[in-house]
């Protein structure tokens, strides 16, 4: 049974790493990064919960006949 020749493997691994780095750099070029991040004024919005949005009628328990 012949053995696998391992001599080209370091070159294959290095070229793969270089290619992945190159592809990553090309993909990062499409992103826009802000150089000076500005703080936005955040206004606090009060979110109403579901029970505040709709009117619910509270029923009394059924009265017992005497």
UniProtKB/Swiss-Prot annotation:
Q: Main subcellular localization, coarse class?
A: mitochondrion
Give a yes or no for keyword Nucleus in this entry.
Answer: no
Q: Which InterPro entries match?
A: ATP8_mammal, ATP8_metazoa
Q: Which residues carry this modification: N6-succinyllysine?
A: 54
Superkingdom per UniProt: Eukaryota
**Keywords of this protein's UniProt record, alphabetized?**
Acetylation, ATP synthesis, CF(0), Hydrogen ion transport, Ion transport, Membrane, Mitochondrion, Transmembrane, Transmembrane helix, Transport
The membrane-spanning stretches of this chain are 8-24
Gene Ontology molecular functions: proton transmembrane transporter activity
Which Pfam families does the record match to this protein? ATP-synt_8
Residues with the N6-acetyllysine modification: 54, 57
UniProt GO BP = proton motive force-driven ATP synthesis
* A cellular component annotation (GO) from this entry: proton-transporting ATP synthase complex
**What is the protein's membrane topology class?**
Single-pass membrane protein
Location of the protein in the cell: Mitochondrion membrane
Q: How does it assemble?
A: F-type ATPases have 2 components, CF(1) - the catalytic core - and CF(0) - the membrane proton channel. Component of an ATP synthase complex composed of ATP5PB, ATP5MC1, ATP5F1E, ATP5PD, ATP5ME, ATP5PF, ATP5MF, MT-ATP6, MT-ATP8, ATP5F1A, ATP5F1B, ATP5F1D, ATP5F1C, ATP5PO, ATP5MG, ATP5MK and ATP5MJ. Interacts with PRICKLE3.
What this protein is reported to do is described as: Mitochondrial membrane ATP synthase (F(1)F(0) ATP synthase or Complex V) produces ATP from ADP in the presence of a proton gradient across the membrane which is generated by electron transport complexes of the respiratory chain. F-type ATPases consist of two structural domains, F(1) - containing the extramembraneous catalytic core and F(0) - containing the membrane proton channel, linked together by a central stalk and a peripheral stalk. During catalysis, ATP synthesis in the catalytic domain of F(1) is coupled via a rotary mechanism of the central stalk subunits to proton translocation.
Q: Which family does it belong to?
A: Belongs to the ATPase protein 8 family.
* Name this protein carries in UniProt: ATP synthase protein 8
Q: Which organism is it from?
A: Alouatta guariba (Brown howler monkey)
State which gene encodes it: MT-ATP8
């Amino acid at each position: 049974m012949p053995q696998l020749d391992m001599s080209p493997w370091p070159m294959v691994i290095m070229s793969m790493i270089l290619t992945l780095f190159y592809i990553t750099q090309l993909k990062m070029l499409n992103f826009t990064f802000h150089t000076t991040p500005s703080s936005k004024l955040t206004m606090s919005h009060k979110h109403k919960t579901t029970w505040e949005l709709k009117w619910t009628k509270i029923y009394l328990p059924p009265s017992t006949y005497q």
